[in-house]
Amino acid sequence: MNRIQQTFQTSSAPFWYAQLELGFCYENSRTIMSHRKHYGPVRVQKMLWPEKTGVCHAIIVHPPAGIAGGDHLTFQIETERQAHAVITTPGAGKWYRTNGKQAFQHIYLNVKDDSILEWMPQETMLFDGALAHSETDIHLEQTASFIGWDMLVLGRQARAENFVQGGYHNQFKLWRKNKLLVADTLYFEGGDRWLSSCLGMNNQAVMASFWAVPPEKFRSSFYLEQHIELIRELIMRMDVPVTLTLLEDVLCARFLGNDVRRCHDAFAAIRAKLRRYWFDLDEEFPRIWKT
């Protein structure tokens, strides 16, 4: 029996232990969900096929709308050969103020050869007083492609709330086969000087990262340099605080500012361009973003 299932079934503590497993495969000219399993309050809200190429758009929802102290939330998602899945959420995620215990989120993404995964959750809000630990592990096979992002908002901006208590620990790793391509680790506590330092957050409330791995045929320096220059031109036209770098053949974008909508618009625009360059696909934003 799955460890998460055991904990969920036997624990009497007032915490949520939730896990969602999804598998996607290509069948009859479109991507379908071949595997779905969940424990606790997390599930697929809806699947859509808005693109002529049969790309599957899946909306995942966590009904408590956030993660509180003691909660454990796990996502395990896999795409099989030729599958193309776009995964998003219906609204902002939340790390709630702690009850004294740490909250955990684990994301495991496995992208098989010749498949594409787009992982595009909406922003996550870190409430003042939250104790949050998040880990993301992405494993790509040799010819797999990936586009994904993570957006973090410190405090509730509508209440002019700052992050003065609590702590946040985030680990991100992106692998191709057994080779580590990207490793990011971030840790800070409420009120840290790093939050106001020009070497850190510089008193900004929104920080975000975007990663993209092209199909194998576009991984040469010729194509990568050409595409990153086109993205730089896009960012300049949009006049947003985004920086771009290449880590081997991984395109990385970073946002640091105070407006999460500008971040979302910038990342969505980058994603739209890369879809056109790499996959010859239209932008086709998830419909839930328009509601």
Curated annotation (Swiss-Prot):
Where in or outside the cell it occurs: the entry states: Cytoplasm
Does Chaperone appear among the keywords?
yes
Q: Which InterPro entries match?
A: UreD
User: Cellular component terms, GO, for this chain's entry?
Assistant: cytoplasm
Q: Which UniProt keywords apply?
A: Chaperone, Cytoplasm, Nickel insertion
Cystine residue pairs: none
Cross-referenced Pfam families, in alphabetical order?
A: UreD
Which superkingdom, per the lineage? Bacteria
Question: Which terms in the Gene Ontology molecular function aspect does this entry carry?
Answer: nickel cation binding
Principal cellular location given in the protein's record: cytoplasm
Task: Give the record's subunit note.
Answer: UreD, UreF and UreG form a complex that acts as a GTP-hydrolysis-dependent molecular chaperone, activating the urease apoprotein by helping to assemble the nickel containing metallocenter of UreC. The UreE protein probably delivers the nickel.
The record's similarity note reads: Belongs to the UreD family.
UniProt xrefs under PANTHER family: UREASE ACCESSORY PROTEIN D
Main function: Required for maturation of urease via the functional incorporation of the urease nickel metallocenter.
Q: What is this protein called?
A: Urease accessory protein UreD
Native organism: Acinetobacter baumannii (strain SDF)
This protein's encoding gene: ureD
